[in-house]
Amino acid sequence: MTDFHNKPNIQIMFDSLAPTYDKINGILSLGLHIAWNNALVSLLGETNHLLDLCAGTGRVALSYVQNYPRASATLVDFSTKMLENVQKRHPSAPFSYITSDVTHLPLPDNTFRLASMAYGLRNLSYPLEALREVYRVLQPGGHLGILELTRPATYNPVYLLHKLYLNLVVPSVGRFYSGNSYAYSYLKESIRDLPRDAALEAIFHAAHLRPIRKRKLLFGTATIWILEK
């Protein structure tokens, strides 16, 4: 398997969510997304410039430059509204911005030592194509850190609780705060439909990105992979 299921027009959807995105994510994750972002930053380690893919409102890039004050970052997202949100809230941040799909990065080969992709993998219609593009722009020996919302294993004691949370709480909170119940129903479905670890890691290998570290967070409700070119 190299492609995920067909996606709706999520570019328009994420543009519409930009004003309330951080607030809703904070509520839905009980604030844990901050710790998860920091865990990704810690596992990536320090470099002078980070390529942050599917950057959204820039929370990972902000965490990165706060942890490594000498660093800067290039933020890539296909949602103009998301990137405008970062620029308005953090005008002095050491960021440059590119509005682009990850499958067609307007960047030269072998440029970046570190790249990140948080909560973006499950939104890709063509993950193998996107990961091959990331491989192209990474330096030899460079690393990509992926943080994604995942499902606990079926034998995990929290599996049923997590399923109920996705089915009942996530769409309700999203509808209440954003007025967009469809978007948060999509969030539920994108987590449910994300392939399990073995299938994902087969895609990583097909893109010539070798998993060198994996960390499960909160009983497997989120997962970090560090991949090496």
UniProtKB/Swiss-Prot annotation:
Gene3D superfamilies with a match to the protein in the record: Vaccinia Virus protein VP39
EC number annotated for this UniProt entry: 2.1.1.163
Residues the record lists as binding S-adenosyl-L-methionine: 57, 77, 101-102
A GO term for molecular function: demethylmenaquinone methyltransferase activity
Pathway terms, separated by semicolons: Quinol/quinone metabolism; menaquinone biosynthesis; menaquinol from 1,4-dihydroxy-2-naphthoate: step 2/2
Function: Methyltransferase required for the conversion of demethylmenaquinol (DMKH2) to menaquinol (MKH2).
Enzyme class: transferase
Family, as annotated: Belongs to the class I-like SAM-binding methyltransferase superfamily. MenG/UbiE family.
Keyword Methyltransferase applies: yes
Protein name (Swiss-Prot/TrEMBL): Demethylmenaquinone methyltransferase
One BP annotation, GO: methylation
Catalytic reaction annotation: a 2-demethylmenaquinol + S-adenosyl-L-methionine = a menaquinol + S-adenosyl-L-homocysteine + H(+)
Domain of life: Bacteria
Pfam families named among the record's database cross-references: Ubie_methyltran (PF01209)
Keywords from the named record: Menaquinone biosynthesis, Methyltransferase, S-adenosyl-L-methionine, Transferase
Keyword Acetylation: no
